[in-house]
């Protein structure tokens, strides 16, 4: 009985001193603590399918890859279909949707602070060196984040949802660069590997690997500094300029946006069509030549009217869109080549004649100048001779008169 009583007393004291005190103290310790808001996992729903523009921005922003764009016969377009089992209810898709198609009962609360980019896994940048300024991307952008600044098109990356509608309508294969996490990680890893070899002295530097010193396209450069880390020469990122170079090509190898390069060709997406100008309808305003970014429109030396060179045409359609009289038509490449064949041959012949005329004119000018110099020299010599002879005749006449005077 005594042992049992002592045990009960011990339990009573333990509970009173330890557990009860702990619970009492817990109230006072946590009186100012605000627990975080918790939301149930409620996947978003396609609330307004009629508003969807099938931009695929929701799909691009989903971190769980739970959204697929599937064609819907009722609405005659692709609509997002969300896998509820994969969805993590992050609400990224709701944030990026430009038309408010998706809806969710509860998603993360907006907090005051710095402005962040739209959630996405890739960024799009227009390559100003390859862009032909057709304006297709600006017109196709569903949220109007592409604008023309100082003669070139620029994407506002903070507002861009990476729907890639601009890429779909761009006539050039490589004019819009996609910078994603995977590519960036690969380039950074490569740069670290080269940098470590450089620091430890294990880097084998090969000179003249590339044919000439590369240049930096300022519109593509994000100033990450990776190229500068691996460069054995000197790169000025403030001026976007390669200062010293041994032509090793390491900077080109690690650049994630292809901003540093030697040359990038313009590759048209379509080659099954081409544009041709109807000379009977053309009024010779030359607006088409002004809007053409690839230099495919030339002016005929014979007719003084514009024509399109199929080899240079990128099929952007800016010329046809801007023509005030609708004189530019879409035809097959063979027809376009046949239509301008005569004009190209004429221009080559006229250019050849003009070059010959310029050459002959230069030669004629030189010959004429030499003749004039020679004539002037001979004229001076003839003048001297005649003056000399006249002086001689006068002297002889004086001598005769003098002799006659003495004899008389």
UniProtKB/Swiss-Prot annotation:
Record keyword Manganese present: no
Gene Ontology molecular function: 4 iron, 4 sulfur cluster binding; metal ion binding; oxidoreductase activity
Source organism, top-level taxon: Archaea
Binding site for [4Fe-4S] cluster: 52, 55, 58, 62, 87, 90, 93, 97, 131, 134, 137, 141, 160, 163, 166, 170, 282, 285, 288, 292
Keywords: 4Fe-4S, Electron transport, Iron, Iron-sulfur, Metal-binding, Repeat, Transport
Keyword Electron transport: yes
Pfam families (alphabetical): Fer4, Fer4_7
SUPFAM superfamilies named in the record: 4Fe-4S ferredoxins (SSF54862), alpha-helical ferredoxin (SSF46548)
4Fe-4S ferredoxin-type domain residues: 42-72, 78-107, 122-151, 151-181, 212-241, 233-265, 273-302, 304-333
InterPro entries: 4Fe4S_Fe-S-bd (IPR017896), 4Fe4S_Fe_S_CS (IPR017900), Fe-S_Ferredoxin (IPR050572)
The name this protein goes by in its record: Uncharacterized polyferredoxin-like protein MJ0514.2
Organism (species): Methanocaldococcus jannaschii (strain ATCC 43067 / DSM 2661 / JAL-1 / JCM 10045 / NBRC 100440)
Lineage: Archaea, Methanobacteriati, Methanobacteriota, Methanomada group, Methanococci
């Amino acid at each position: 009985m005594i042992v049992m009583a002592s045990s009960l007393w011990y339990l009573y004291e333990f509970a009173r001193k330890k557990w009860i005190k702990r619970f009492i103290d817990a109230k006072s310790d946590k009186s100012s603590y605000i627990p975080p808001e918790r939301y149930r996992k409620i996947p978003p729903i396609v609330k307004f399918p009629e508003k969807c523009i099938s931009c695929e921005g929701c799909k691009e922003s989903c971190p769980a890859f739970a959204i697929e764009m599937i064609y819907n016969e009722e609405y005659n377009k692709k609509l997002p279909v969300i896998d509820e089992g994969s969805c993590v209810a992050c609400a990224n898709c709701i944030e990026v949707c430009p038309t408010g198609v998706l809806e969710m009962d509860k998603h993360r609360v907006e907090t005051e602070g710095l402005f962040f980019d739209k959630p996405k896994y890739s960024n799009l940048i227009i390559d100003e060196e390859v862009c032909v300024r057709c304006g297709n991307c600006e017109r196709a952008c569903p949220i109007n984040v592409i604008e023309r600044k100082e003669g070139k098109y620029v994407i506002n990356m903070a507002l861009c949802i990476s729907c890639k509608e601009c890429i779909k309508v761009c006539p050039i294969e490589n004019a819009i660069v996609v910078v994603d996490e995977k590519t960036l990680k690969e380039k950074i890893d490569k740069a670290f590997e080269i940098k470590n070899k450089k620091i430890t002295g294990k880097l084998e530097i090969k000179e003249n690997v590339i044919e000439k010193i590369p240049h930096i396209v300022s519109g593509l450069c994000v100033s990450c500094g990776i190229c500068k880390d691996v460069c054995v020469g000197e790169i000025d990122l403030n001026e976007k300029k390669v200062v010293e170079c041994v032509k090793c090509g390491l900077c080109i190898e690690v650049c994630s946006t292809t901003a540093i390069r030697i040359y990038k060709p313009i590759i048209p997406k379509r080659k099954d069509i081409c544009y041709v100008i109807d000379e009977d309808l053309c009024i010779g305003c030359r607006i088409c030549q002004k809007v053409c970014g690839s230099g495919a429109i030339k002016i005929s030396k014979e007719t003084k009217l514009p024509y399109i060179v199929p080899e240079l045409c990128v099929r952007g359609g800016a010329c046809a869109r801007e023509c005030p009289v609708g004189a530019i038509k879409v035809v097959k490449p063979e027809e376009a080549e046949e239509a301008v064949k005569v004009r190209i041959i004429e221009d080559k012949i006229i250019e050849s004649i003009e070059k010959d005329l310029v050459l002959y004119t230069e030669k004629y000018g030189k010959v004429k100048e030499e003749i004039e110099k020679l004539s002037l020299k001979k004229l001076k010599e003839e003048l001297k001779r005649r003056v000399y002879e006249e002086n001689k005749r006068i002297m002889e006449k004086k001598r005769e008169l003098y002799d006659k005077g003495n004899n008389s």
